[in-house]
Swiss-Prot record:
GO biological processes: translation
Quaternary structure (record): Heterotrimer of A, B and C subunits.
Active site: K74 (charge relay system), S149 (charge relay system), S173 (acyl-ester intermediate)
Species of the source: Cenarchaeum symbiosum (strain A)
Entry protein name: Glutamyl-tRNA(Gln) amidotransferase subunit A
Family: Belongs to the amidase family. GatA subfamily.
Gene that specifies this protein: gatA
Length: 479
């Protein structure tokens, strides 16, 4: 049996129980056979890199702590020499000339990048259906979405097409697909992980985070990728040691269930799972109660106003003069040239750019944007007050079960509401983890734990306690 977690992989390869080549070959074989469409680009040199790692181990040479672990990277994170398309025709064929800081840190610890995973175009979406390369599929049910926008990263880990992956989380884009695919997803405190080399969507909100099979694996990944970076002025210092204290427990900690995220509009099966998870945390020694965040009801509107405004600014560079799709000049008329270039954007990116231009236009005096910023500030204050009373805040990650591909494509507002429980952590910069807790009607349900800024270790410790008491099957039905 091959290892099924990153920590187990490192232990097995380190002890000679398996080899990097054996595991990597298995991951490549599964990628070719399973039909999850998790990748946009595969690393054709992965097996050669695995053999080199095995050779170094055999010779007794010093090898980084990843020991050749095959790790996938979302296609909006730059890897030198690989295509970085952001799942958009606008960047078709673009190869990054440099590595993102998170990739540099993984490679320094001798990880192998298996490839670039599928996503919603420019990370704008919740299902991967807005990818220019077609949707990815959920390993639990291939007719269902794996979530988004990091759906390919979650599907790849869920299908053991890699042992762990990186995604970006702007409003839940790591936690949402992790929940839908029965994996662990972690959004760190804003600034704890460098965004250098991440193609920008909404700079003040987004964060790179891991998608893994266990909480221990997420802690391992955080030990590798976190910390200050001179290339990203928003980063903060980090002590690390996330894995060392992972089993510290939750005894005596106060956990508050956010009532607005577990009440009206939630799927009854998810509501029942949430009550059960709360009881499980109490069984682990936590003191549980309920807490209200009144501003949550405005959070999705504020989130989409702010992110659309930042996206419109960030994507303005794709005007076909310095950045964007390389097309022949058919006219010397400047505005016509830009207009034709922008047709390469897909429908969701276009929708959000139009929204961003509208809410930030001088004709409206920026009043929509400023109101959204006010909501963000009030929500942050409420969250701080709640976390002064409670150590951690609990909610289901997503209020509904994974749904079929195509089911919500005609309902953009309904799709936006899938982010209802996750955007608060992004708007307030707080760490949050999604933990697979149970299975309802053959589909996984994840629980979200949110903590104080820089309380990432505490969130992971609580997530580990919940994982140990989860009702997930030992092996998913497709394995």
């Amino acid at each position: 049996m091959l290892p099924e977690s990153l920590v187990e992989y490192v232990r097995e390869v380190g002890s000679g129980g398996t080899t990097c080549e054996e595991f990597t070959a298995g991951a490549i074989e599964r990628t070719k056979k399973q039909g999850l469409d998790a990748y946009i680009t595969l690393n054709e040199k992965a097996l050669d890199e695995a053999r080199r790692i095995d050779s170094r181990i055999k010779k007794g040479e010093k090898v980084g702590r990843c020991l050749g672990a095959p790790i996938a990277v979302k296609d909006n994170i730059c890897v030198r020499g690989m295509r970085t398309t952001c799942a958009s025709k606008m960047l078709e064929g673009y190869e990054s000339p440099y590595d993102a800081t998170v990739v540099t840190r993984l490679l320094a610890e001798d990880a192998i990048i298996t490839g670039k995973t599928n996503m919603d175009e420019f990370a704008m979406g919740l299902t991967t259906e807005f990818s220019a390369y077609g949707p990815s599929r959920n390993p639990w049910n291939k007719e269902c979405t794996p979530g988004g926008s990091s759906g390919g990263s979650a599907a790849a880990v869920g299908g053991l097409e890699c042992i762990a992956s990186l995604g970006s989380d702007t409003g839940g884009s790591v936690r949402n697909p992790a929940s839908f695919c029965g994996m662990v997803g972690f959004k760190p405190t804003y600034g704890l992980v460098s965004r250098y080399g991440l193609v920008s969507y909404a700079n003040s909100i987004e964060q790179i985070g891991p998608i893994t099979r266990t909480v221990e694996d997420a802690a391992f990944m955080m030990d590798v990728i976190s910390g200050a970076d001179p290339n990203d002025a928003t980063t903060i210092e980090c002590k690390g040691g996330f894995l060392d204290g992972i089993d510290a427990g939750i005894k005596g900690k106060k956990v508050g269930l956010i009532t607005e995220m577990a009440g009206e509009g939630i799927d009854p099966r998810v509501a029942e799972a949430t009550r059960d998870a709360m009881a499980a945390l109490e069984d682990a020694g936590a003191r549980c109660g309920k807490v209200s965040l009144d501003m949550v009801k405005y959070s999705v509107a504020a989130y989409y106003t702010i992110t659309a405004t930042e996206a419109a600014s960030n994507l303005a560079r794709y005007d076909n003069t310095m950045y964007g799709y390389d097309m022949p000049i058919e006219s010397y008329e400047f505005h016509s040239y830009i207009s034709k270039a922008r047709r390469k954007f897909g429908p969701e990116v276009t929708r959000r750019m139009i929204l961003g231009g509208f809410v930030s236009s001088s004709g409206h005096g920026g009043r929509y944007y400023h109101r959204a910023l006010k909501v963000r500030g009030l929500l942050a204050r409420e969250a701080e007050e709640a976390l002064a009373e409670y150590d951690l805040l609990l909610s289901p990650t997503v209020p509904i079960l994974p749904f079929k591909l195509g089911e919500k494509m005609g309902d953009p507002v309904g799709l936006f509401l899938v982010d209802y429980n996750t955007v608060t952590a992004n708007l307030t910069g707080k760490p949050a983890a999604s933990v697979p807790y149970t299975v309802c009607d053959g589909l996984p349900v994840g629980m979200q734990l949110m903590g104080r800024p820089s309380g990432d270790a505490e969130v992971l410790q609580a997530a580990y306690s919940l994982q140990e008491r989860s009702r997930m099957p030992e092996a998913p039905p497709w394995q």
